[in-house]
Amino acid sequence: MRRFSTWLLLAAALTLGVSGIVHAQDSFGGPRKMPAKEAPKPTLKPTPTADGARAGGAPGLDQLTQMERADYGIPASRMLHDGEMHGPTPSSIPGGQVVTTQGMLDLQRRKVPHVIIDVLGAPEQLPNAVPGVWLAQPGSFTDPVQTRAVQLLQQVTQGQRDVPLIFYCRSPYCWMSYNAALRAINAGYSNVLWYRGGVESWKMAGQR
């Protein structure tokens, strides 16, 4: 009977020892395995469709118009800009009008005769644009650049001073087309349109 009790005590001690070893391995031998957490479900964003916006987050025409007419607090001037050509521009131009991408598309849809003059000179251009980067040069309305501008405008309009003349460069942060438009206004053209949004707005509208 005493021998049987001794065996029971030995068995209990072995059981406790194994349990302690297993517990020690769980605590110090490495991290205990936790149940895998479920990955968060992706949130689906609605595809923009209002106002002509394309899939992928491209702005619609209404949004583009707001961007193109943004007021940066820069006063409009009748004088040629002689500072940095890449910076915020006025939201208007004396003697001319700001035309938006929506307005450009309306002109095309109604097939209104007009002349587009590219004052940027980048590889990406608006369709049928006349090269005129040099029109952006600062100076005065009596300098040789103005004389040359008068000759070019006479040629592309065939002498019709009421033909819509559209000047563009890169974006509302580009003064080059502003200067070119001022030269046309000073030359006596009555329908000068400054496409302030430029080639960047044109591309954002999905145009090529």
Per-region residue spans from a language model:
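Short, glycine/charged-enriched secondary-structure capping and boundary segments
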Residues: 129-132, 180-183, 207-208
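Positively charged, proline/Ser/Thr-rich regional signature most characteristic
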Residues: 92-95, 103-165
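Bacterial N-terminal signal peptides that target proteins for export
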Residues: 1-8
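Pro/Ala/Gly-rich low-complexity, hydrophilic intrinsically disordered segments
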Residues: 66, 205-208
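Catalytic cysteine-centered active loop of the rhodanese-like fold, especially the PTP/DSP P-loop
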Residues: 149-202
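Flexible, polar/low-complexity N-terminal or interdomain linker segments that lie immediately upstream
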Residues: 22-116, 120-127
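Bacterial N-terminal signal peptides
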Residues: 8-17
